[in-house]
């Protein structure tokens, strides 16, 4: 039997599989070059993965691709960003470049990667009295997929030597109750640095509104779009009733951010609706970092593969080149939700699938009971199930028309309260007339 040609093999493979490996190879080549990873180092890492045979074959391919790409750049006298970092480290370490600066300032330090940390260390060690001044927030470290390694931040002294650690604890974005609740939530991971947050804005009770949404299969986007539109109309109407007072205070439109975990959930296809009194924009959780708005609406804060936290796992081949996942379950997903949660100054609406709310909803209720309110998209209060504390109490009728209140998570939760049918109120005059009538009947 003759072997298949490359073209025949490629034709037999699903396009989705080809696309997947294109992405994996591109990411790995980037990190191989920036971190100067040798084939032997990669093969050693491959032996630590679950599928060692697959990983070793992949190393042979991807390292060859990285070599060919590097050669192509050299032949065309070009340089890419990864070359800049790697070459800079080599030039500093070999003394080809001597920095005239004794103070190295680094912003957004929570996003630091191994190659960039190597460059900072090389610059620091050029002179005995060089200092590193780094500013960052480990609670907002959300870029592991680009090579960010949070341990470089949390283990600063192990990487850069003895240090002084200051605290920037004041926030000018969230109100105090929202800030406290979000801080308690993210610090449930014991590996996060402990901090207190002091807000310049006073606490606003029930700053977090949980809105259960009935979602039909394959119609998630439509369901969340409908609920989001009702909330937006509420906000626009509310501000409209205070338009004169708002304008007198010299304020512009109220700002609202609609946020989602994955871009496929964008309910407006990149074209958010316009209103008279509010300005609406939408983007992903990751892209919202650094932004703020008066209100935010977070979509599909529910359990599921593409939910919050996301259960989509990276291909283990990426562990050849990026930091290993943290031991604490969904550590980066927790930080990502924290980032999305803290974009609002006044309040945040969490739109959840009514039958599979995110585990984070229950946690928020535990750490901030006065911050959370359950309501419909129209603003009506919803009572939570007193048994499971996850579902909501909904009304219905049994086959015999007896009304009841039960948990929305049935049959997972069987809590149910049958409600007695009240008899109509009987007036004293009617009761007296009935007594007289009965007496006459008895006299017959």
Question: Across the structure, where does each feature detected by a protein language model lie?
Answer:
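A basic/glycine-biased coupling hinge at the interface between accessory DNA-binding modules
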Residues: 1-79
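Conserved helicase NTPase motor core
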Residues: 51-151, 170, 290
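Conserved RecA-like helicase ATPase core segment
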Residues: 114-212, 310
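Helicase P-loop NTPase motor core
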Residues: 162-164, 171-277, 329
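A short beta-strand element within the Helicase C-terminal
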Residues: 281-314
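C-terminal accessory regions
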Residues: 302, 306-378
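Short cysteine-rich clusters marking metal-coordination/redox-active sites
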Residues: 385-388, 407
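Short metal-binding segments enriched for Cys and/or His
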Residues: 409-436
């Amino acid at each position: 039997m003759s072997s298949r040609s490359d073209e025949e093999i490629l034709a037999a493979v699903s396009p989705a599989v080809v696309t997947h490996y294109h992405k994996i190879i591109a990411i790995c080549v980037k990190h191989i070059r920036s971190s100067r990873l040798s084939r032997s180092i990669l093969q050693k890492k491959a032996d630590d993965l679950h599928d060692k045979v697959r990983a070793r074959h992949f190393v042979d391919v991807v390292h060859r691709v990285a070599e060919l790409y590097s050669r192509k750049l050299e032949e065309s006298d070009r340089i890419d960003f990864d070359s800049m970092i790697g070459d800079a480290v080599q030039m500093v370490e070999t003394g080809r470049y001597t920095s005239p600066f004794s103070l190295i300032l680094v912003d957004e330090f929570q996003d630091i990667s191994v190659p960039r940390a190597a460059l900072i260390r090389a610059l620091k060690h050029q002179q005995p009295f060089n200092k590193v001044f780094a500013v960052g927030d480990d609670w907002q470290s959300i870029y592991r997929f680009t090579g960010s390694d949070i341990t470089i931040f949390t283990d600063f002294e192990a990487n850069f030597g003895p240090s002084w650690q200051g605290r920037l604890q004041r926030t000018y974005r969230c109100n105090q109750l929202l800030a406290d609740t979000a801080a308690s939530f993210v610090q449930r991971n014991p590996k996060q640095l402990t901090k207190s947050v002091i807000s310049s804005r006073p606490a606003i009770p029930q700053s977090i509104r949980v809105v259960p949404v009935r979602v039909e299969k394959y119609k998630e986007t439509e369901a969340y779009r409908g609920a989001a539109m009702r909330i937006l109309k509420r906000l626009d109407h509310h501000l409209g009733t205070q338009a004169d007072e708002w304008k007198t205070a010299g304020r512009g439109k109220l700002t609202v951010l609609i946020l989602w975990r994955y871009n496929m959930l964008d309910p407006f296809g990149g074209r958010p609706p316009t209103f008279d009194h509010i300005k609406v924009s939408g983007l992903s959780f990751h892209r919202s970092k650094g932004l703020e708005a008066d209100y935010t609406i977070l979509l599909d804060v529910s359990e599921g593969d593409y939910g919050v936290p996301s259960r989509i796992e990276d291909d283990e081949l990426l562990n050849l080149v990026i930091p290993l996942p943290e031991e604490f379950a969904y550590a980066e997903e927790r930080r990502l939700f924290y980032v999305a949660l803290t974009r609002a100054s006044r309040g945040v609406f969490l739109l959840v699938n009514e039958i599979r709310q995110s585990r984070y909803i229950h946690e928020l209720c535990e750490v901030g009971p006065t911050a959370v309110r359950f309501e419909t998209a129209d603003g009506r209060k919803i009572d939570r199930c007193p048994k499971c504390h996850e579902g909501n109490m909904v009304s219905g009728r049994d086959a015999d028309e007896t009304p009841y209140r039960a948990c929305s998570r049935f049959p997972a939760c069987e809590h149910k309260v049958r409600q007695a049918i009240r008899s109509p109120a009987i007036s004293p005059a009617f009761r007296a007339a009935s007594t007289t009538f009965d007496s006459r009947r008895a006299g017959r």
